[in-house]
């Protein structure tokens, strides 16, 4: 989830941009998403956390218990009823990597094509010809991504069948399973867009704007941190980050002026909080798929994740407070990354004292 949240070529980008499209932001939905990436502290700090933890070679919380158990006894706590999947001797690493690379390349090409990079865009204009960044900002993710997905799917089927990794019959049997897996996200996105329309029709944006108009500048600067915490709680309780986008993004755009840097920071805080809550929620589809893929007990997976997630989230709160006041991405990064490393050093010191 943290990776998808900062990837412009993903269904998550489409979810955020579609929710923000048509709101009073002054830019397109995909442009808003791209501008929000540098301030998405949860995703960025998660990478820092993982890399630092790997180099420092320690664990804490329930994860430490399970890691020690695995090292000493070899017990990986695999599910007892997990099915033993037959290993295909014909499969190679390239069979996984090549379709993914084709998907990325074709989706990128599809999005800049719709945005007008190669000439006339989907809207009939020619302003973005040869302008990669401009074409990305002018694109419609819901037009570009499906074409990329369809072409990549066709390539994958032809490639794997030609290599005789799977039969054509097996390939066709996988397609309905893929459609079934996407029913829930599509329904969530549809309901989120409907909720956005309802909020707009009720005039919630006008109410929130009037409510915040007389607020002190200090309160405005603290709002990104508040938005992050609210998004965390909402996503954790509901188990869906996409639904959180639909609820909070229209409210965030009503709070901050379209030309304000705080609007970008607020959207980033919303996205970061939604991913954080979704990341550790026991009813989240991403958590369920992660535990199922690792063949471990679902509640044990959630229990081992929560201390790590809360550590990153705590640093994010401080980071968004700093971002709200300084409104400078480089200062925000410096403070957040330094604090993340300091927190890990302190935790490692505490764990060593416990072990002594």
Ranges and model annotations:
Residues 156-233:
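Helix-loop-helix junctions that connect adjacent transmembrane helices in secondary transporters/permeases
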Residues 1-63, 234-246, 267-293, 304, ...:
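Alpha-helical transmembrane segments and, especially, the helix-loop junctions at the ends
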Residues 18-26, 59, 108-121, 161-168, ...:
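Transmembrane helix-loop junctions in multi-pass membrane proteins
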Residues 39-41, 92-95, 145-146, 179-185, ...:
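Membrane-interfacial loop-to-helix junctions in multi-pass transporters
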């Amino acid at each position: 989830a943290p990776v998808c949240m900062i990837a412009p070529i993903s269904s998550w980008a489409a979810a955020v941009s579609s929710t923000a499209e048509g709101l009073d932001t002054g830019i397109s939905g995909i442009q808003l998403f791209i501008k929000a990436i540098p301030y998405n502290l949860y995703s960025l700090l998660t990478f820092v956390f993982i890399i630092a933890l790997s180099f420092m070679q320690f664990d804490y919380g329930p994860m430490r218990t399970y890691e020690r158990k695995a090292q000493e006894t070899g017990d990986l706590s695999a599910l007892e009823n997990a099915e033993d999947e037959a290993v295909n001797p014909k499969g190679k690493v390239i069979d996984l990597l090549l379709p993914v690379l084709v998907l990325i390349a074709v989706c990128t090409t599809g999005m800049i094509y719709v945005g007008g990079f190669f000439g006339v865009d989907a809207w009939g204009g020619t302003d973005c010809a040869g302008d990669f960044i401009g074409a990305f900002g002018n694109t419609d993710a819901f037009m570009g991504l499906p074409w990329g997905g369809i072409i990549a799917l066709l390539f994958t089927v032809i490639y794997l069948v030609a290599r005789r990794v799977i039969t054509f019959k097996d390939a066709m049997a996988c397609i309905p399973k893929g459609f079934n897996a996407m029913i829930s996200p599509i329904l969530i996105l549809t309901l989120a867009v409907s909720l956005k329309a309802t909020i707009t029709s009720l005039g919630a944006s006008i109410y929130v704007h009037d409510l915040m108009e007389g607020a002190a500048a200090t309160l405005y600067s603290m709002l990104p941190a508040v938005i992050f915490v609210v998004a965390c709680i909402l996503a954790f309780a509901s188990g869906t980050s996409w639904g959180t986008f639909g609820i909070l993004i229209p409210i965030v755009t009503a709070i901050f002026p379209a030309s304000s840097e705080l609007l970008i920071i607020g959207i980033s805080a919303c996205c970061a909080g939604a991913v954080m809550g979704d990341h550790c929620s026991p009813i989240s589809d991403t958590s369920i798929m992660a535990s199922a893929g690792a063949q471990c007990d679902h509640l044990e997976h959630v229990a081992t994740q929560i201390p790590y997630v809360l550590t990153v989230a705590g640093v994010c709160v401080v980071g968004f407070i700093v971002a709200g006041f300084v409104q400078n991405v480089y200062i925000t990064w410096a403070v957040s990354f330094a604090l993340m490393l300091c927190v890990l050093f302190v935790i490692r010191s505490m764990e060593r004292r416990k072990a002594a």
